[in-house]
From Swiss-Prot:
Gene3D superfamilies: alpha/beta hydrolase (3.40.50.1820). It is an enzyme of class 4 (lyase). This is 2-succinyl-6-hydroxy-2,4-cyclohexadiene-1-carboxylate synthase. It comes from the Bacteria. Belongs to the AB hydrolase superfamily. MenH family. GO terms for biological process: menaquinone biosynthetic process. Its EC number is 4.2.99.20. One of its GO terms (molecular function) is 2-succinyl-6-hydroxy-2,4-cyclohexadiene-1-carboxylate synthase activity. Signal peptide: none annotated. PANTHER family: 2-SUCCINYL-5-ENOLPYRUVYL-6-HYDROXY-3-CYCLOHEXENE-1-CARBOXYLATE SYNTHASE, PROTEIN PHYLLO, CHLOROPLASTIC. It catalyses: 5-enolpyruvoyl-6-hydroxy-2-succinyl-cyclohex-3-ene-1-carboxylate = (1R,6R)-6-hydroxy-2-succinyl-cyclohexa-2,4-diene-1-carboxylate + pyruvate. Keywords: Lyase, Menaquinone biosynthesis.
Length: 252
């Protein structure tokens, strides 16, 4: 089994870029950024529970990474950079730390490296369980209205919240809930030590208004690019700034 994806071929010899979206996004999320790198092969993946992969069930990160590997093989992508946002960034970090073949570099935007104690994991497990129950039982417009009131999204304007709520409400609440539980931050190990030992380039992107993740970026051995005029979802709020950073990283 493989994940649904959209593949855009590039020029021979150019690096392949594999993009992983955030929770409740899909393969279209990174395209405004990725299409600026038309010389590179680009693969935009729908994670399980999302988009064209909505019906694919997973029990945890191991299943997601197995599906990611199978998808890369199916597209004959042998050497690549992983670029992931939030949930996609956490999947990318997990894959990198487990040693996914062919990975040349890692770019994470607003991805958490992991909680550091059992109390924090227990609290997060409880919180994610409550959200999952709401996704299963309530209208998605109501759930996402509240979702975007969380502190990490404090920099969003009312108009941005409204637009995101409308967009994300097109998802399937049941499959979102299942993926939220399977890949909860509570189920993710603390990756700091493993990330600090990576043998390939690791870069971290965060919005200048995203104080939480700017602080987390200092805890991993990554070169940090701060994206101006952006909060947690920097590639949506300032795609040109993210394009500039990726161009510097990839030296294109």
């Amino acid at each position: 089994m493989m994940l649904h994806a959209q593949h855009m071929p590039g020029q021979p010899g150019a690096p392949s870029l594999v993009f992983l979206h955030g929770f409740s996004g899909d393969c279209r999320e990174w395209q405004p950024v990725g299409e600026q790198f038309h010389g590179c092969s680009r693969l935009y993946i729908d994670l399980p529970g999302h988009g064209g992969s909505a019906a694919i069930p997973v029990g945890g990160f191991a299943d997601v990474i197995r599906l990611l590997r199978a998808t890369l093989i199916s597209y004959n992508i042998l050497k690549f950079w992983l670029v992931g946002y939030s949930l996609g960034g956490r999947v990318a970090m997990m894959a990198a730390c487990q040693g996914i073949p062919g990975l040349c570099g890692l770019v994470v935007e607003g991805g958490h490296p992991g909680l550091q104690n059992e109390q924090a994991r227990a609290e997060r497990r409880l919180s994610d369980g409550r959200w999952a129950e709401r996704f299963r039982r309530e209208p998605l417009t109501e759930v996402f209205h509240d979702w975007y009131q969380q502190p990490v999204f404090a920099s969003l304007t009312a108009q941005q919240r409204q637009a995101l709520t409308a967009l994300r409400s097109q998802n399937n609440g049941e499959t979102l809930a299942a993926m939220l539980e399977a890949t909860s931050l509570a189920a993710q190990p603390d990756l700091r030590e493993a990330l600090n030992a990576l043998a390939f380039p690791f870069y971290y992107l965060c919005g200048e208004r995203d104080s939480k993740f700017r602080a987390l970026a200092q805890e991993v051995a990554a070169t940090c690019h701060v994206i101006r005029n952006a909060g947690h979802n920097a590639h949506r709020e300032n795609p040109a700034g993210v394009v500039d950073s990726l161009a510097q990283i990839l030296r294109l």
